[in-house]
């Protein structure tokens, strides 16, 4: 277990939570943006975060870690590397060069689409899907649907942050996707 500068054992979840910056009224008034760049800038925080995910999934017999565009691309490949499994990108529409499968989902105002290469995984492959944050759950649900369409077994959805007041983690769990998040923040 990591230790604080005083030598006392460090609560890794509380430490990760403390490393996330809140930016009020960004990108629009009323939004409290949870900025993970401060967490990523700290080698200690990044190591603790990666270790939390690796400890959770080391015995899960995974084939891949899938990351959601864009901030899921930051942590998912590191976790995949540490677990000695492959990384699968799930991208915004029009960003992948090969044949793709796509899935649209609703946003608060409008919709969006994500894609995956049609050969990204095989039937029966065990995959976790990662993002930085779960808000409404739409992106992770779309990613799960794409992976399942390719025949993958989606073991769990994982994120650094949950915003439970927005209902995404509940929506995902109710749809049968187990969810793991390191920390949560009230509000949005």
Swiss-Prot record:
Pathway: Purine metabolism; AMP biosynthesis via salvage pathway; AMP from adenine: step 1/1
Keywords assigned by UniProt, alphabetized: Cytoplasm, Glycosyltransferase, Purine salvage, Transferase
Catalysed transformations (reactions): AMP + diphosphate = 5-phospho-alpha-D-ribose 1-diphosphate + adenine
Record flagged with keyword Nucleus: no
Top EC category: transferase
Domain of life (superkingdom): Bacteria
Intracellular or extracellular location(s): Cytoplasm
Major location category of this protein: cytoplasm
EC number: 2.4.2.7
Family classification: Belongs to the purine/pyrimidine phosphoribosyltransferase family.
Protein name as annotated: Adenine phosphoribosyltransferase
């Amino acid at each position: 277990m990591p230790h604080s500068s005083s030598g006392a054992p460090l609560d890794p979840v509380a430490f990760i939570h403390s490393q996330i910056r809140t930016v009020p009224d960004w990108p629009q008034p009323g939004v409290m943006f949870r900025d993970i760049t401060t967490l990523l800038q700290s080698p200690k925080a990044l190591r603790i975060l990666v270790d939390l995910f690796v400890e959770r999934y080391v015995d899960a017999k995974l084939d891949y870690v899938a990351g959601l565009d864009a901030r899921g691309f930051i942590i998912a490949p590191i976790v995949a590397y540490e677990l000695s499994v492959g990384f699968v990108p799930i991208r915004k529409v029009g960003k992948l060069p090969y044949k793709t499968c796509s899935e649209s989902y609703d946003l608060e105002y409008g919709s969006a689409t994500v894609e995956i290469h049609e050969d990204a995984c095989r039937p029966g492959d065990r995959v976790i899907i990662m993002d930085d944050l779960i808000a409404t759950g739409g992106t992770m649900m779309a990613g799960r649907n794409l992976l399942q369409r390719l025949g993958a077994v989606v073991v769990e959805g994982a994120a650094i942050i949950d915003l439970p007041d927005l209902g995404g983690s509940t929506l995902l769990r109710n749809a049968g996707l187990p969810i793991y998040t390191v920390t949560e923040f009230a509000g949005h």
